[in-house]
Amino acid sequence: MRNFDLSPLMRQWIGFDKLANALQNAGESQSFPPYNIEKSDDNHYRITLALAGFRQEDLEIQLEGTRLSVKGTPEQPKEEKKWLHQGLMNQPFSLSFTLAENMEVSGATFVNGLLHIDLIRNEPEPIAAQRIAISERPALNS
């Protein structure tokens, strides 16, 4: 029996839990910046991006429809450096997530090199049935 991990595919689909469980595995996911997607409960999620070396003004978060985009453009050093080892990335990036229909961004914070984007699922109130009265005379005069 084989087990397949579909989480790399579904990491960028937030709020589609049943779909995430049904799909699992396909393709490579973007490796920079590293990020986590945390589910607190059925209605609260948090995306955390590790952005060492970035400043708050280097970052932009945009929500367009159900597409959440995060972009980072770090200030480039004035002079070229010679690295003996470079393990920290300080490069521009663009990352996007597709949110479920009723997901909204409730806030974002940038603390100690971690960008936290909080999401909430707002389930719409079901529309109550409306009773229509039937009159004795026709609605249209013919």
From Swiss-Prot:
Induction profile: By heat shock.
Family in the record: Belongs to the small heat shock protein (HSP20) family.
Domain remark text: The N- and C-terminal flexible termini are involved in oligomerization and in the binding of non-native substrate proteins, and are essential for chaperone activity.
GO molecular function terms attached to this record: identical protein binding
GO cellular component: cytoplasm
Pfam families hit by this protein: HSP20
Keywords: Chaperone, Cytoplasm, Stress response
Thermal behaviour (record text): Thermostable up to 50 degrees Celsius.
Residues covered by the sHSP domain: 26-137
General function of this protein: Associates with aggregated proteins, together with IbpA, to stabilize and protect them from irreversible denaturation and extensive proteolysis during heat shock and oxidative stress. Aggregated proteins bound to the IbpAB complex are more efficiently refolded and reactivated by the ATP-dependent chaperone systems ClpB and DnaK/DnaJ/GrpE. Its activity is ATP-independent.
PANTHER family: PTHR47062, SMALL HEAT SHOCK PROTEIN IBPB
Record protein name field: Small heat shock protein IbpB
UniProt-annotated location(s): Cytoplasm
GO biological process, one term: stress response to copper ion
Complexes and interactors: Homodimer. Forms homomultimers of about 100-150 subunits at optimal growth temperatures. Conformation changes to oligomers at high temperatures or high ionic concentrations. The decrease in size of the multimers is accompanied by an increase in chaperone activity.
Organism: Escherichia coli (strain K12)
